Amino acid sequence: MKSSARSAQSAWLVEKIISGGQTGVDRAALDVALELGIPCEGWCPRGRRAEDGVIPERYPLQEAPTSNYADRTALNVRDSEATLILAKSPLRGGTALTQKFADRYRRPCLVVDPREAKSSAIVIAWLSANNARVLNIAGPRESLRLDVARDAANFLRRLLNRKLVTKKLEPKRVVHTTT
């Protein structure tokens, strides 16, 4: 039997998290991935620039060619299979730009409020429907909404701290008998 990450009996809900390292949702995504042992990476602005200063080295991020946040956002969307935005609508600033880049790169994009109870089920169904395993996670920075990182981290722990069973079903063998 040929094996691959996607046909394994049991695999993480996502195989890799991509995020940009900004305060808020980006860091929450990276923190939860590191905590759960899910591979993570992403692009950050040149100089590891974020609203609180330099992004700590513990985050496995590659510096983009420029210090422009928009360039970093485009690279993260491009390098993912889908983008999950954790935010309450309407989207603003860089979060809205993330959604525009998802449209440009023709990547599935879902916006959910991490404080809504039904959001986990919606995300699981969306990931399965899109067969998305490399997930860009984005949302507001901490200065735009207090506690956004905490809410995002709690949501992502509940969402990602489970296995997605991808058991390959064998076709049923039908035996006809005559009497």
What residue spans do the PLM features occupy?
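Low-complexity, intrinsically disordered tandem-repeat tracts enriched in small/polar residues
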Residues: 5-11, 170-171, 175
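Acidic/glycine-enriched connector segments
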Residues: 12-134, 141, 148-159
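Charged phosphate-binding loop/patch that engages nucleotide di/tri-phosphates or the phosphate backbone
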Residues: 144-179
